[in-house]
Amino acid sequence: MNLYERLMWTAKENRYPMHMPGHKRAGLFTMANPYAFDVTEIDDTDNLHQPEGEILWEMEQMKQKYGTKDSYLLVNGSTCGILAAISACCHPGDTIVIARNCHRSVYHAVELLSLKPVYVYPEVDKETGICLGISSEEVKRVIADTKPACVVLTSPTYEGVVSNIRAIAEIVHEENSLLVVDEAHGAHFAWSDKFPETAMEQGADLVIESLHKTLPALTQTAVLHRASDRVLAERVEHYLEIGRASCRERV
């Protein structure tokens, strides 16, 4: 069985996918010929690296929905956004405070920029072994001694645990540091008041969300939100240029 046959077999299985991506293979739109949508940066299809038309409109709509300064669409996942966000906040050799349960892309950013990591540890549920939230008291204790360029947390976690981002943001900003939140599993928060507040609403500076995890978007679709002017848009956009694929997939 080749890959095409395997995917066709999976698609025909009568099973509900209790996993990513968020569209659950629901067939929200019909695309009989995917090749018809696969085009390069010709005049009529806009350019993700210099959006002026439909892509710019999409980002403006997202900015209004999420209440941000800027929202940048990503086609190579939250990993791209995390690398760009940390690069925009730090210079090579800086100290960075990160939650020990962060995504591996955070550690890749530490490696690429030769950053000095200092860890904050989540509490652990003794019965399940699941990591709980990061306490604001622990963040305050750690950053008082380290004066990091930025603090990076994951909220919600893979298991859905949310930290008190509002309290943490206040502490981080009192120390003239920046707060980056990996909200990859919380892109749906803004769509109902029954969900927790987004990290943007609670004062984080840069927030990364994976639209494909909990919303009806194709795999690798993500967004980087610039939620405050503490981080220059020019720096964010510069590092997105470096991290984004030069050949974009529009589908």
Question: What kind of feature is each model-predicted range?
Answer:
Residues 3-9, 29, 50, 65-68, ...:
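Conserved PLP-enzyme active-site core in the AAT-like
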